[in-house]
């Protein structure tokens, strides 16, 4: 509920629309427009066209980073360390929301060039490790 309220307040301040990606009936009851079970193309399109993604999902954080979309991450009750790790890797810890009264986090700059470089470097390292592990 706090994250939903934050999304509505942030959208009002920035004059944005809230669009939720829904996977169940309960998602329809929340505020804003809900896109239920979008196709892969629609799903990625929502990320690409978003002014900002507000999420407590590691995967949504990763999509935002890979697609160059502004985002705000919230640590969920579980699995928060994955989000913290990718934010640290990409130097985007400033995009972590720690208080629901912080509306300035959205204005903090993301060095998208650095993010892209760090992700490419990590991919290269991981592919090299995998090739060695498989003796290829």
Q: Which residues fall in each region the model found?
A:
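Active-site anion-handling motifs in enzyme catalytic cores
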Residues: 1-136
């Amino acid at each position: 509920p706090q994250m939903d309220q934050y999304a509505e307040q942030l959208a009002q301040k920035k004059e944005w629309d809230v669009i939720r990606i829904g996977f169940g009936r309960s998602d329809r009851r929340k505020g804003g427009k809900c896109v239920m079970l979008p196709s892969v193309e629609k799903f990625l399109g929502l990320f690409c066209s978003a002014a900002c993604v507000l999420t407590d999902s590691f995967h949504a954080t990763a999509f935002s980073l890979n697609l160059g979309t502004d985002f705000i991450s919230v640590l969920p009750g579980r699995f928060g360390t994955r989000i913290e790790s990718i934010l640290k890797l990409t130097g985007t810890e400033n995009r972590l929301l720690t208080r629901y009264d912080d509306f300035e986090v959205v204005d903090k700059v993301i060095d998208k060039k650095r993010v892209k470089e760090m992700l490419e470097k990590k991919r290269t390292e991981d592919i090299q490790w995998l090739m060695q592990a498989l003796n290829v």
